[in-house]
Amino acid sequence: PHDYLYRGMGFGYEGEGIGDSVVLRGKMMFMEEDQRTRSLSEGEKWNYLKDDDEIQAGLWRNLGASVSRGYNTYPMDVCGPSFFADETIQNVLARRSNVHEESARWPHEDVPCAVMVIDDTSVLEEDLTVQYQYLAVIHQRLHGLSRCGVPFRVHLFEDLERDDFPDC
């Protein structure tokens, strides 16, 4: 799913996994776009999109990030009627659907980008008392890379050995 804590305005569209490694292996990164909006009954929890302008910007941001990184995204909400019953949101999703379908025919190529490389075995070598993995990996990816304004990718350490690793 879309990372729960960082899905509001000012953040990127990041899943809770290493999607770029999934795509590199020729697999589909299927990302649940659990985007909370003003239509929820949860109040101000979960960093939601608050009005029509934020809804437009946030939902298009999510599709743009997904398409540009080779992910497939699908809108999903589990909290009441939410955006399934909101006309503004449904209109945005209908327009996005056309763009999403068309994007499969667009030329795609790698572009120069920043790369975060994660050693997924490193957690075995630490004592976990200072939450280093959260600070060094999750926090930096969500608070740093997704907000820095440049293209980036997140890969596993073992990806560097692959012949098809992109020239980032």
What positions do the PLM features span?
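Carbohydrate-binding surfaces of carbohydrate-active enzymes
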Residues: P1-C168
